[in-house]
A protein has these predicted regions:
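Catalytic cores of RNA-modifying enzymes
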Residues: 1-211, 251, 260, 267-274
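An accessory alpha-helical subdomain
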Residues: 185, 189-191, 197-237, 242-245, ...
């Protein structure tokens, strides 16, 4: 088959293509795939991981925003392997249209660095989250999600209401083309049996977390007062009612503590604050 033309990675899309076959095999192995499962790959790029997934007995859908990739390298892969390609921005994808209605699926992705967090928010906190996600992110972002070194970031405080997370392994820049300037980590995100926040409240919960981290170097009382535009005395009462020390920093607040605070704020008459 004649090779199709592809102009190369696009910086604006955060493209760093994973070439390392050893890493690709490790990622897929950690997904614990069984015959007949539904698999969604986001950002298949040049199709290196797609090729391996498509050789398995799974129902594979690959979503790629880059039309040049879809018409070029991915068309070559699909010519000899069976899977579905959706040429679309995954952030605009209607999840009710993929696989069968109500069917479970697993998410596998080398996430684009520039929108990885937004993609995880959309999929993991929505009404149709994957049962398991094995994804690549910048190591620093991944560590903030899993509460490494006792520090929980915005994404960790948010996603912890929907999934259990752990870092599986790190990946060197040399495994990508072009190589990123930072180390990457592969995350395992397993869906909770019941989310701690209902999907219809996920957006407000995320905004509340952002408010709580508005001044991350300050004490939680000052950060929340600033983010929610409340008097420190009001925040002190909420913290006391939630059994949280007001001098702690936002990064030390656990997921369950964030949820307790959110529930308190949500019951206020002026809950439009969030």
């Amino acid at each position: 088959m004649e090779k199709t033309y592809y102009p190369g990675p696009k910086k604006r899309l955060g493209q760093h293509f994973l070439y390392d076959k050893r890493v690709i095999r490790k990622i897929i192995a950690r997904a614990d795939l069984v015959d007949g499962e539904n698999v969604l790959e986001i950002g298949p790029g040049r199709g290196h991981m797609t090729s391996v997934l498509a050789d398995l007995d799974v129902n594979l859908i690959a979503v790629e925003i880059d039309t040049d990739l879809v018409r070029g390298p991915l068309s070559e892969v699909s010519a000899v392997r069976k899977f579905e390609i959706i040429n679309k921005d995954v952030l605009e994808l209607d999840l009710s249209t993929i696989f069968g209605s109500g069917e479970d699926y697993k998410l596998i992705s080398n996430l684009p660095y520039n929108v990885g967090g937004r993609i995880l928010r959309k999929f993991l906190s929505g009404t149709r989250p994957p049962s398991l996600s094995i994804v690549m992110l910048q190591r620093e972002v991944a560590e903030n999600i899993i509460n490494a070194s006792g520090k929980l970031g915005i994404m960790g405080a948010f996603l912890g209401a929907f999934v259990e997370s752990s870092i599986l392994f790190t990946v060197k820049p040399s495994s990508f083309r072009p190589p990123p300037k930072v180390m990457s980590s592969v995350l395992r995100l397993s869906r909770l049996d019941r989310p701690l926040i209902s999907p219809d409240k996920a957006g407000k919960y995320f905004q509340f977390i952002i408010s709580g981290f508005s001044s991350p170097r300050k004490q939680i009382r000052n950060s929340l007062a600033h983010g929610l535009k409340l008097a420190p005395s009001e925040v002190d009462k909420m913290l006391t009612d939630s059994n949280i020390d007001s001098v702690r920093r936002p990064e030390t607040i656990s997921v369950l503590e964030w949820i307790r605070l959110f529930d308190l704020v949500s019951t206020r008459k002026d809950s439009s604050l969030i």
